[in-house]
Amino acid sequence: VVARRQAPLIIGLGEGEFICASDTPAIANFTNIILPMEDDEIALLTPLGIEIYDSNNERQYRNPVSLKVSEQIIDKMNFKHFMLKEIYDQPHTAKNWLETYLIQNLENGQYQIKYPFDTNFFKSIERIEIIACGTSKHAAMVGSFLLEQFSGIPTNVYYASEFRYSPPPLLPNTLTIGVSQSGETADTIAAIDMEIKRRSQIKDKEFRPNLIAITNRRESSIGRQVSNIIDICAGIEV
């Protein structure tokens, strides 16, 4: 029996075995098929298979997920340690990210951003709030400066841990951006969930939740929580 509460948990489906871990690197060498669990769920692992129940004891059904090839390759190459490898990977990672999201117009030579989701809701946005923790908040602060400079839209950055207990007043036509490298930051997940719930209680469409998540793990908790995902394409974290 395994249970998840406010921390990530995945179940790996191996050959004649189940493997439980908090993240994919721990099981990547044993299986490439995983079953992510949601918060407050309990799983029974038996010789006949897996049974998942929510906090109301209702049976849950979902399909397993296949790991990307890059997530199964954990090799520090010829570097002394993974941190050094990741530092030297930064130019390639930045190039990969730019090539993924910036498309050049051959007629005028200008670049346009290619979002992996429908951006029609951008038209009504009047303010932006960014929720993050740690170094993600540092990146968010730089991002808020750029957003205000290029879009002219007022942008505020909040510590997710503070946002949870002292949220700003609800304002209409707000874009909420959650930033988490791992996609498993507990405070950021809780803050996004709270923002979704408090905005969903208001019937006025101007207060509806408009959400984007920036993460390195599309299949993470935040990736499942928010449908509009910007993947930073930095590869697996070790």
Protein language model regions, located:
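N-terminal segments that mediate ammonia production and transfer
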Residues: 1-126, 136, 145, 149-150, ...
